[in-house]
Amino acid sequence: SLNHEINFPNEITFIINGYSQADLRQLTLNYQIGESKVTGYIHSEIEQEIVGKAFFGLSKLSTSGNSYIPSGVRIKYYFEGRDMNGNQYVSLTKEFDYLNPDYQWRDTQVGAMTIFWHGFQHLDVAKSGEKAYVAIQEAAAISNLQEIEPFRAVIINNPREAAEAFPTVSNASLKDGLYGGFAFKDYGVFLIGGIGTDGLTHEGT
């Protein structure tokens, strides 16, 4: 079975366990972040029983500092194993949304934009999102964009939450009580403070 644990905002632990008649010598975690070309692999710690053949593998992916990964991205992963004879084994692929597990997240779809949020009224989020998306469509038309690619918005409620979710470069702004937003084009996601239409429009364009 495959499992993951989010230790937000520092790291994600990926776990695989099961039974194999093969004598596994190597386990590797392979992952992809969002629809981007950002992929990677991590060699896993592996334990296997000699008799029962139960095995356990664990990998940790850093998500902060120089390895910062923004909230809201979808992460796909699977494990590859090799036995003592060099035979290769591949697990199923699993995917999940990388969000702070301390909150009960909901999502709202507006056109090509998926909004992740918590602590607000759904109607307020939907209204703000719809107004912002109209402005985003107008900006796209001016830029002669034929189609708006799917993207994601993560609503950050307050400076305390922003301190964990935003990249460390924003610490100075947070100390001043400011928290605006950050867009991550490569990941197709942006983080924004509050559900104001102007903020959603600015980061969305």
PLM regions with names:
Residues 1-102:
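Beta-strand-enriched, solvent-exposed domains that form extended recognition/catalytic surfaces
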Residues 105-205:
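Juxtacatalytic substrate-recognition/specificity segment
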